[in-house]
Regions:
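A short acidic, Gly/Pro-enriched loop at the edge of an enzyme's catalytic core
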Residues: 107-119
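A C-terminal cap/extension of S-adenosyl-L-methionine-dependent methyltransferases
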Residues: 110, 163-168, 198-245
Length: 245
């Protein structure tokens, strides 16, 4: 895929800011079982350990950032929007010390280069303008042996398209990057960024109101093992490890 021009990237970023700085109640941080399972699934898949320095790309209001910090990761947030980062600070209040950075991941602050054990994100990669360029930039933020890991929607799950049609806070313009979230696209992009041990897996089954119900997590764990369901499970994890120079 050809890299976007700086002007095209800037316009893309402006569209994303307009999209995300709208009032989105679903993005407010909570401690629901649904969100906690996302955090635990990504942390396990990426091999994160408490105390490791972790950068969350596209952290927004801290929906996942706060849960990561509460689990003992030295997490920092990076986002295009100072508005969303200010909301993150208000949710964290005095409970957590969370360094945040207003930047495009393609042009990160120089102080962040080679600084992180992991660069991660939740439902952020499909909003990024240029996958190849952005993943190469993320790899520069890692220590040797560091990992990139993302949780993304599965474009083969038809319920996402129903959501986009029915929920006013979701739009095709804002979320159409989901179509690129296929292993055949993401894994080669990770490898081109200098990463090895590239892998993916799918998980999940229920929407939040069922996943948060009593026994929802146990039922999901059973349904995930049913082979015909596996290609359409709603969530995907992707990872890669920075190869030694």
């Amino acid at each position: 895929m050809a890299e976007l021009t700086p002007e095209a990237r800037a316009e893309h970023n402006r569209r994303q800011l307009r999209y995300y700085e709208q009032d989105k109640p679903g993005m407010v941080p909570t401690r629901s079982p649904y969100l906690q399972r996302h955090v635990d699934a990504l942390a396990g898949f990426a091999g994160l350990r408490p105390g490791q320095r972790v950068l969350e790309v596209g952290c927004g209001m801290g929906r996942y950032t706060l849960l990561l910090a509460e689990r003992g990761y030295a997490v920092e947030g990076l986002d295009l929007s100072p508005v969303l980062l200010e909301r993150l600070r208000s949710f964290a209040r005095d409970r957590l010390e969370l360094p945040v950075h207003v930047a495009d991941v393609v042009e990160p602050p120089a102080a962040l280069l080679g600084a992180f054990d992991a660069v991660i994100g939740f439902f952020a990669l499909h909003h990024i303008h240029d996958l190849s360029l952005s993943l190469r930039s993320m790899s520069r933020l890692l220590v040797p042996g560091g990992r990139i890991a993302f949780l993304e929607p599965n474009p083969y799950n038809p319920l996402y398209y129903v959501q986009m049609a029915m929920k006013p806070e979701m739009t095709w313009q804002g979320d159409r990057g989901m179509l690129r979230m296929r292993p055949g696209v993401i894994l080669p992009a990770l490898e081109s960024a200098g990463l090895g041990d590239c892998a993916y897996r799918r998980f999940g089954f229920f929407p939040p109101f069922l996943a948060n119900a009593g026994g929802g997590g146990r039922a999901e764990a059973v349904l995930e093992r049913v082979r015909p369901f596996q290609p359409m499970l709603p969530f995907q994890l992707f990872r890669g490890t920075l190869l030694s120079a």
